[in-house]
Amino acid sequence: MNILRDTSLESNPYLKINFDGGDLSSDAGLLLIKEFAEKIGLVKIVYQLFKTNDTATFRLHIDPENFLQMVYQTIAAYFEDDCSDELTVDPIFTAILGKPALASQPTISRFFNRMDDTTLKQFDQIEKLMRDIVYSIKAPEYMLFDLDSTLLNTYGNQEGEAFNYHYQARGYHPLLCFDGITGDLLKLELRDGTHYCSNGADKFMEPLIREFRTKHPSLPLYLRGDSGFASPELYEVCEVNACEYAIRLKQNSTLVALAEYKAEDLRQVTKHNMVDYAVTYGEFMYQAGTWSHPRRVVFKIEKPVNQFLFVYTFIVTTMESEPHKVIRFYCGRGKMENFIKEGKDGFDFAAVSSKSKIVNANRLRLHGLAYNLFNWFRRLVLAANMRKLRINTVRLKLLKVAARAVRSARYTTFKLCSSCPYKKEFYETLQNIRGLQPQLE
């Protein structure tokens, strides 16, 4: 029978292949993820807090196990529920979950379908507790809230999906807030496709800002957002909670008129040279019709190379820095696009294929937690020469390592690939995990 299953290569008929290798896995690096998740208390917290509205009196595969299975699968790039069927007896997955077989695709799908508003609140609790633990290891010097939205494409009749005119595509339009320094995903909310960027942004950010202000009273807080988030309600939330902000304003004739004094200076500077780049900065106090009081607006006027027209940038801010420093601070929010790209490409944030919006919201939150677990892993314990790498590269180099399980009466030994070129980084990461001293209580 083995002869029938063997396949010879046309390039070399003396080389044969089959999938009868036995107790092998290609995901030995997940042992590091498991060790880290245990060390920072995530596994214990999930078992304590996460439970769906399940009426069954007995489950072979309980909710916390299903939860962690999908987190590990997401980190290993097995995004689909169907992948569970192929991984049922994978020696690495069964070892890190401590069970003889994984939950099947129907079990995982039913698990997601049981999720509701209550489980969304449980995600909030889990993420708050995990932030406290992670900050006990390495506390931030200041917090930089980067606020943005993105499009998650849909291709069916999902509840809440719609055509979004900004992106010119159908989908959901979730709201995201990242730590602009570390890349941690601080908050995530799935919204209908028709929602405008700033819709509910103040209610979205207020609990998060208050959490940091309450737990870290002396921590400097900053917020950045593009013109889609230019709403007085968000300004006031920041001002009440002593959170400095720099939010772009859409250009209009009033703002351009107020900046005219600097535009005239730029015309004088460039009148004999309309080819080279030129720039000037300024500021003024401004009160829009919907604002309760005047606010500081800084601006930049630049003349691009080989262009005659000026380009204006207006930022409303509570920061006291010089205009050019505020502009430079705001422009740093471009890093957030990389965080969003990492979430969508590396952790499949677009896994919103259920007909139910609430189920899709829970799926998104689970993928967001997988993103955070890896991001904490990367910046706290990953080998130093790998900490700037993206998830796909780390998967290739450190997570997708072949291993053979050798079982004895008392132990299971995983014999990893002898020719792995990243043994040093593997052991360095493991040593870093052992050196962590998180405050779990």
Please state what every model-predicted region is.
Residues M1-Y196, A201-K215, R378, V401-E441:
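Dynamic "connector" segments at or just before major functional cores
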Residues N2-P13, E244-D345, A403, E428-E441:
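An anionic, glycine-rich sequence signature occurring as long contiguous blocks
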Residues L9-L15, V46-F50, T88-P91, N306-V311, ...:
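Short acidic (Asp/Glu) and glycine-rich catalytic loops that position anionic groups and cofactors
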Residues F36, Q69-M70, S84, S104, ...:
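Short, conserved catalytic/metal-binding motifs centered on acidic residues
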Residues F36, S84, K325-N362, L366-F377:
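Short amphipathic alpha-helical "interface-anchor" segments enriched in bulky aromatics
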Residues A56-E65, V305-N306, S354-L364:
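Structural motif
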Residues Y196-T254:
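Domain-level cores of phosphate- or acyl-group-handling catalytic modules
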Residues F349-L416:
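Basic, amphipathic alpha-helical segments enriched in Lys/Arg and hydrophobic/aromatic residues
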